[in-house]
Amino acid sequence: MPKHDSLWLKSLRWIQKHLVHTIVVPQDPFADLNLDAFRPLAYVMKTESLSDIAALSEITAKLGLPSPYEPLVANGVIAPRVVCLQGRKPLFGERAGNEPFLECFMRLLAVHKERPELDIQLVPVSLYWGRTPGKEDDTMKAAVFERENPTWLRKCLMILFLGRHNFVQFSNAVSLRYMADEHGTDMGIAHKLARVARVHFRRQRKVMTGPVLPNRQALFHSLLKSESLRKAIQEEAANKKISETQARETAIEYLDEIAADYSDSLVRIAERFLTWLWNKLYSGINIKGAEQVRQLHHDGHEIVYVPCHRSHMDYLLLSYILYYQGMVPPHIAAGINLNFWPAGPMFRRGGAFFIRRSFNGNKLYTAVFREYLDQLFAKGYSVEYFSEGGRSRTGRLLAPKTGMIAMTMNSVLRGIERPVTLVPVYLGYDHVMEVATYHKELSGKKKKKESVWQVFGAIRKLGNFGQGYVNFGEPITLQNFLNERAPNWRTELADDPEQKPSWLTPAVNVLANRVMTNINDAAAASSVTLTSLVLLATDQNALERSLLERQLDLYLTLLKKVPYTTYTSVAEGDGKHLVQQGLELNKFVVCADPLGEIVSIEASQAVSMTYYRNNIIHLFIVPSLIASCLTHNEQIPRQQVVSIVADFYPLLKAELFMGIKDVPAYVNQVLDFFIEQGLVVETDTLTVVPEHTSQLLLLASSVSETLQRYAIIFNLLANRPKMERSELESESHLLAQRLGALHGITAPEFYDKKLYGTLSVKLKELGYLADNQDKSNINRIRDQANSLLRPSVKQTIVASVTAEHTV
């Protein structure tokens, strides 16, 4: 290799500086890969390449990592900073052997034998000039851009045409101290290191580029030859009294309607457009948990992303983030309503496949869709779908639609060998551009059909949207889930493949709820969501700025000292910083008088801001319930607080998809936190410290509307124990409307019929709607709910229920 200060290399670096734009994965190797800045470090690369090392040099200079041109000096031994597995490929003939590179491994290992305290970090580095996966029928393009083993001439062409799409990926370091101690330092170990590194680089390339793309028509013909589709076509012909040729044509039409037509060229163009768009819209996109997903890809998992659905922006945001995190954008299940010009064709070329909202008993369509989904899994494409079935209009997670999850489960049952893993994803925004539309729809206005004019309308409204949040939740590997739910599932299916197992539907329902719970476990507490939570808990949606900042400091400290889960993310900075962020986004207004500043939510925006509060209400609902217990009782034993929370938690869990593993332990941690913060003192009982009552009252207000719902339900059940589920739902909804009208409750979810349906299902499951239920439990929970309400609200509920019962 020429010296790094030679005229040739200086010229090469100058050319690359103007032609090459490099993206680093991960963005912060020190933080994401736990690299130790105080230990010596060497790089291992697949192929010796002057241009690759020049690109790496640019990046290491920016990241503060050792330059690949600087030799590694350890114990008096000088070794190259970069170890390559194979030499450069000449324009003609064969490349040189890898003996010189094995010698490098040997020298590094030998140094560890001489110096027991030495531990060199060996960091694998992969470089990609473009990320085209290639096609099954590639010919000319593959010959020109042979990416894995290019000659210097091909590399020049790649830099010229693909230099703006250069990716440098760092991987977890290998400890040479561990290798030397565990396996020795001879040539055999050097060979083993080289073999492991080659496998690593091969897997990394597949993670970065994805599997080769099929010819679309060839894919259709392949699918039509499958046994299940042939059978479905025959049944369609028999049932509709048409020829098999006509039924086959219908199946092809369905495939054409459904199937994606992924284009790497369009993805590259979209990447540039989206980079411009995000920079225009957002001041930053916060990502948490991407490394675990990258590792799952590397380990050969079939990944299914299951994000929450807040906005049409979700389709773009997750794919963009995955692309920049060194993973292939998934094939996305999009509603057929989005298949309009020009969005539909663009989405399809970006990897979207389209699904009808209802299959309406169409067996042929069902068979075609299922076979297409199976093929995506079989070929190794990652998939994305929204299990809620539509965008949330209230900011809360919707009850899951189980259709896609059931199809994924069935694909596993039909024999996918690789592990299939669902990755829940929390998507959050400081500003959702459809919120005003959601409010109108909840008020009774008919939803507009998606069209190109809506796209233009949305573009006109682009502005400062603050920050976006992408948090990856705890993954669920389906094979492990099935082993947990039905240990003998493989044997059962082998014995009778055609028989639908009795445990399948309940297992799908449990899985769907677990996915939603894991999404909420990964929530992002941001400046907008936290400030909305505080201000909407006040009577006039307004608070003195200093008190608001103090309350936000309390919430931030609570989330950090008693974390909801390890997947949850919390905004950086203090309360003062969060308030300033919210004001800069024009989400809140501030006015000043001689006594100080008051921050508030404008009356016209109050209902819309409940959307952001609802994104994180589950993070604070139990602490809020605890605060309510404390502020409604002068003294209360710790165990009584634990018992009250235990009574309400099953309903909270069903309503808000909560996943607290040990509820009593969590309650005690929150109580200990209140004591540590000086809000509460404990002798034999718990007592609120008078000067901090206002903070706990403000926190307690966040659970008040939830407790009002439960008070309505349990007062009805106590008065009419034999009430049917349908009656309970309708009567609860009617009383909620009356309560809202009398007490000014405007939150949309308070009147949501589906929410009362969810609660009634849970009540039946808990036995509260059974003929032989224990009425004492209902009365106890009714009394607890009533005791935590404002007297005027309690009076309205009790009087309304009593009057209705009398009638």
From Swiss-Prot:
Q: Name one GO molecular function term.
A: glycerol-3-phosphate O-acyltransferase activity
The record's section on SMART domains has: PlsC
* Residues that span the membrane, as ranges: none
Cellular component GO terms, alphabetical: plasma membrane
How is it placed in the membrane, per its record? Answer: Peripheral membrane protein
The alphabetized list of GO BP terms reads:
CDP-diacylglycerol biosynthetic process; fatty acid metabolic process
Look up the domain of life of the source: Bacteria
Task: Name the EC number(s).
Answer: 2.3.1.15
Q: What is its main location?
A: membrane
Keywords, in A-Z order: Acyltransferase, Cell inner membrane, Cell membrane, Lipid biosynthesis, Lipid metabolism, Membrane, Phospholipid biosynthesis, Phospholipid metabolism, Transferase
* UniProt motif HXXXXD motif: location: 308-313
Which pathway does it serve? Phospholipid metabolism; CDP-diacylglycerol biosynthesis; CDP-diacylglycerol from sn-glycerol 3-phosphate: step 1/3
Where's it found, cell-wise?
Cell inner membrane
Q: Which CDD domains does its entry note?
A: LPLAT_DHAPAT-like (cd07993)
Q: Please give the catalytic activity noted in the UniProt record.
A: sn-glycerol 3-phosphate + an acyl-CoA = a 1-acyl-sn-glycero-3-phosphate + CoA
Q: What does its UniProt record remark on the domains?
A: The HXXXXD motif is essential for acyltransferase activity and may constitute the binding site for the phosphate moiety of the glycerol-3-phosphate.
Q: Which family does it belong to?
A: Belongs to the GPAT/DAPAT family.
Classification via NCBIfam families: plsB (TIGR03703), PRK04974.1 (NF003441)
Q: What is this protein called?
A: Glycerol-3-phosphate acyltransferase
Organism, by scientific name, is Shewanella baltica (strain OS223)
Q: What is the lineage of its organism?
A: Bacteria, Pseudomonadati, Pseudomonadota, Gammaproteobacteria, Alteromonadales
This protein's encoding gene:
plsB
